[in-house]
Amino acid sequence: MLEVIKAIEAEQVRSDLPEFNVGDTVKVHQKIKEGTRERVQVFEGTVLKRQNGGARETFTVRRVAYNVAVEKTFPVNSPLIEKIQVVRKGKVRRAKLYYLRDRVGKAAKVKERI
């Protein structure tokens, strides 16, 4: 039974997405359906965490705009995600960057990996 589940999950995993890690700044192009219209909305921010693996993998992106912080969690293998662009690579030493929630301004900045 377990082999059947793993085989089904392996079919659903996307391979067209770039490699990105926690601390990277990414642009997520997400399809939004409003009535009969469909458009693409771009959400840019820092990746706070990546959870699980395989077909159920998710990642959370945080951005601060006009002094309001917004965190969105996206499923990696969702068909609603059109593409993910890595804007810059971040240098971090943690798997979950929850400490960024308490920081404001330049203190919330992640160093760039060269």
From Swiss-Prot:
SUPFAM superfamilies: Translation proteins SH3-like domain. Pfam families: Ribosomal_L19 (PF01245). Signal peptide: none annotated. The keyword ATP-binding does not apply. InterPro entries: Ribosomal_bL19 (IPR001857), Ribosomal_bL19_CS (IPR018257), Ribosomal_bL19_sf (IPR038657), Translation_prot_SH3-like_sf (IPR008991). Keywords: Ribonucleoprotein, Ribosomal protein. GO terms for molecular function: structural constituent of ribosome. One of its GO terms (cellular component) is cytosolic large ribosomal subunit. Disulfide bonds: none annotated. Belongs to the bacterial ribosomal protein bL19 family. PANTHER family: LARGE RIBOSOMAL SUBUNIT PROTEIN BL19M, RIBOSOMAL PROTEIN L19. This is Large ribosomal subunit protein bL19. It comes from Clostridium botulinum (strain Hall / ATCC 3502 / NCTC 13319 / Type A). The lineage of its organism: Bacteria, Bacillati, Bacillota, Clostridia, Eubacteriales.
